[in-house]
């Protein structure tokens, strides 16, 4: 089970994400029991995770970027990043060695297909993030709006992807636990390695995910509050 540490970065600082309510995000030091800094490199130096997922909240919301920091982060840990990709040329903005995450909140299905094909030509692959809120798909593509996430998972099966992230923003930072009915259906529907983001509250959830066949989990809150040992991400 891949335990991937999450860095939500806004205006150069790591913030505590809660239920996708971005206006209320606060520096991670106001929440964490573990870190003394919200500066990304300093935080990584303290926690030493092997693998990280970075959400560049500035790029996702169209207000600046944290690309320099992402490049530096990739020198300290294996890195995947969501930079709000909405055009094929956005792939070129990512620093080398960083795996692109194509989130449905900003990327259309046609863009996801084009990006997967382009990356395959260069021997690399992207991850797709199925972005949801309260179980409903968040989609920039009008053609995806209202589509069932399980149906979308099936429609991605023909693509050459590194994996698919299931990210329900309503569960992010909330330690709500697992929707086992949905997750079992997702595991059955997808041919790709699946990674869950949002809601994981402790080690028992990681064990349940592994039993369902998930490849990994995005972790932040449960690490910062001590419910999941730091050793899991190191």
Give residue ranges: language-model regions.
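Hydrophobic faces of well-ordered beta-strands that scaffold small-molecule active sites
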Residues: 2-9, 52-54, 79-83, 100-102, ...
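Conserved anion-binding
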Residues: 9-29, 96-172
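N-terminal beta-alpha supersecondary unit
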Residues: 18-62
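Short, acidic/polar
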Residues: 32-45, 88-92, 144-155, 206
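N-terminal active-site wall of soluble small-molecule enzyme domains
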Residues: 43-94, 180, 184
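Glycine-enriched alpha-helix->loop->beta-strand junction motifs that scaffold or abut catalytic
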Residues: 48, 76-79, 93-101, 119-126, ...
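Charged helix-capping and loop-helix junction motifs
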Residues: 64-71, 142-153, 176-184, 234
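Glycine-rich phosphate-binding active-site loops on the catalytic face of alpha/beta enzymes
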Residues: 88-90, 97-114, 168-171, 198-232
